[in-house]
């Protein structure tokens, strides 16, 4: 009995023992690199897939069928179209059959099925089940061919006609409403909202930042668009409690309002890795051994329907590129701006990115190089401008700003000819 209690109330259950922790973190998530116990690294399962679907299965749900039937409208909206069409057809056919049986029983009890009887029938021209079924269809769909009609002989028949008319209106309203709600769901809008394949960590304005890119493939806007992010990882509390997926908010500018974006062209979302960030103690070496997932969420209202949509994606630790930046996609033309989505997922390496954590960088344990680093964004913009000028017949300049044999990864050690640079926002 004691052994049973020991297994039952142990700090980490046998199932949790099977989940190998890549790191056992302290403080705000990752420690400083000295307090970690590294185990055999494994590729964790995604909690949120790249297409936004949650990788979760519910089991042992009590009274699942009753709970789904209690919220039948939401159930009809969420199910697949094939099942929705089955419910659509069954709702009408079963109601026609039910009331057809009722009118047939009324005719049977009143003796209307006897052809030799000359008394007034409850429902004229209803002398078989087929005729009763057709009368039910005509009543509920308000067709009224004129051959079959209810009489004042039987009050029950009159009541059933009124009752079927009301039931038919309810079925029409429910089924048509569910179909329209399903068609108007903004879920398909997510097909034209994209996240970059990889997130990056690089310096921006003198601070180490986590960045990812979002884009809108439609010209219609996403109203009140805003972003948020969470870091998911396993951890053990100071009391010994094991939390399989601890959710930690990642600040993307909620307090200052910069989490709200104007998503006309692709935008890079920036998370400044400061002392409040769960990535504050994470270095390049720690990133290679880390086991976590960053879930990114984009929310907004569809301009056409004013319905709220949510687009999701996630990045595992091995999908975050340290020391990279995104290639520019927005270029200024003569009378408009051009967005090149072929560059949307592309990145380039920034050689001078510090490999230490943001904490070490803030404590001046890593000295940043003062050498002028090569600005790839400006080079791309100038190259694009030269290509456009050559297409328009403008002769190319014979002078070059950069020697052709220079390795781009070693630009920090090569003196560049001074020239006016342009920010990516200006590109």
Curated annotation (Swiss-Prot):
Keyword Isomerase part of the UniProt annotation: no
Cytoplasmic side: 1-81, 179-427
An individual GO BP term: potassium ion import across plasma membrane
Membrane topology (Extracellular): 107-128, 148-156
Name used for this protein in its record: Inward rectifier potassium channel 2
Chaperone as UniProt keyword: no
Modification note: S-nitrosylation increases the open probability and inward rectifying currents.
GO cellular component: membrane; T-tubule; voltage-gated potassium channel complex
Tissue expression summary: Highly expressed in the ventricle and skeletal muscle, moderately in cerebrum and cerebellum. Only low levels are detected in kidney or lung.
Highest taxon of source: Eukaryota
Recorded topology in the membrane: Multi-pass membrane protein
SUPFAM superfamilies associated with the record: E set domains, Voltage-gated potassium channels
Keywords for this protein: Cell membrane, Ion channel, Ion transport, Membrane, Potassium, Potassium transport, S-nitrosylation, Transmembrane, Transmembrane helix, Transport, Voltage-gated channel
Residue interval(s) of motif PDZ-binding: 425-427
Parts of the chain that traverse the membrane: 82-106, 157-178
Residue list for modification S-nitrosocysteine: 76
Region annotation (Disordered) ranges: 384-427
Pfam family, one: IRK_N
Family: Belongs to the inward rectifier-type potassium channel (TC 1.A.2.1) family. KCNJ2 subfamily.
Assembly behavior: Homotetramer. Homomultimeric and heteromultimeric association with KCNJ4/Kir2.3. Can form heteromeric channels with Kir2.6/KCNJ18. Associates, via its PDZ-recognition domain, with a complex containing LIN7A, LIN7B, LIN7C, DLG1, CASK and APBA1.
Main location: membrane
Activity regulation details: Activated by phosphatidylinositol 4,5 biphosphate (PtdIns(4,5)P2).
GO molecular function ontology, one term from the record: phosphatidylinositol-4,5-bisphosphate binding
Annotated compartments: Cell membrane; Cell membrane, Sarcolemma, T-tubule
Polyphosphoinositide (PIP2)-binding: annotated segments: 181-208
Functional note: Inward rectifier potassium channels are characterized by a greater tendency to allow potassium to flow into the cell rather than out of it. Their voltage dependence is regulated by the concentration of extracellular potassium; as external potassium is raised, the voltage range of the channel opening shifts to more positive voltages. The inward rectification is mainly due to the blockage of outward current by internal magnesium. Can be blocked by extracellular barium and cesium. Probably participates in establishing action potential waveform and excitability of neuronal and muscle tissues.
Organism annotation: Oryctolagus cuniculus
Gene: KCNJ2
